[in-house]
Curated annotation (Swiss-Prot):
Organism: Naja oxiana
Taxonomic placement: Eukaryota, Metazoa, Chordata, Craniata, Vertebrata
Keywords: Cardiotoxin, Cytolysis, Disulfide bond, Membrane, Secreted, Target cell membrane, Target membrane, Toxin
One cellular-component annotation, GO: other organism cell membrane
The protein's name: Cytotoxin Vc-5
Nucleotide-binding keyword on record: no
């Protein structure tokens, strides 16, 4: 997950109200993203699932 300050053409901007980018992946397979997108609050990681969040709504 790369957090962006500037907006390149291929970056995604989140809708209003969900202004954090996040990526979710399994701890057992850290290089295989399970889900990514926009969220309002960064979820807590668990023993099985890890979340990586940006503090911005622009990411790729």
């Amino acid at each position: 997950l790369k957090c962006k300050k500037l907006v390149p053409l291929f970056s995604k901007t989140c809708p209003a109200g969900k202004n954090l980018c996040y990526k979710m992946f399994m701890v057992a397979a850290p290089h295989v993203p399970v889900k990514r997108g926009c969220i309002d609050v960064c979820p807590k990681s668990s023993l099985l699932v890890k979340y990586v969040c940006c503090n911005t709504d622009r990411c790729n």
